[in-house]
Amino acid sequence: MAGFSDPCLSELPAFIKEGCHRTIGRKAFNKKNPITPDILKHLCILYGSDSCSLSDLRTCCMCLISFAGFLRFSELVHLRRSDICFHENYMSLFIQKSKTDRYREGSSVLIACTDEITCPVRMTRRYLDLANICEQSDQYLFRPIVYCKRSNTYALRGETCLPYTRAREILLNALGSLGLDKSKSSGWRCYCRCKSRY
């Protein structure tokens, strides 16, 4: 090319192309804010009171177990009663199938007792008692709930686990009841404004 080097092999066009891809070539990333222990405390106050329903206690228990055990939704909803073992100061969860478990061997997750209102072990015991799930049961822990008009109570229904979409909806509704937006940071500002109510 007339004695000149090829301009396409220069670093400048590669950097320009990469910069263009970074600014306009990719979809906007909607980064979510993490759930904090303070948010969990407010969830427990709202959903985990002594007179709460089975539906509210399920919501609280799902949030606490998934937070304390670093569980994904799929791992949480596939927990069975036989996968839980209570000990004096902790409980162990056996995760049968996980996204990161390449050989499908399963793994155990230990969750410690705390003396706080956000104790996942105590909340799980309360949930199991209220749901009438016996220790020898092999049923899913989190199942759909039906409302009984005659007795004015909630009861677990069926033998199938809670669908992923419903579990996600329960969590988002619980966060929404605290004033948190389901999208990005605008909910955090709203949460800070209404925090004094709880």
Question: What do these predicted regions represent?
Answer:
Residues 1-198:
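Extended, non-catalytic subsegments within catalytic or DNA/protein-binding/adaptor domains
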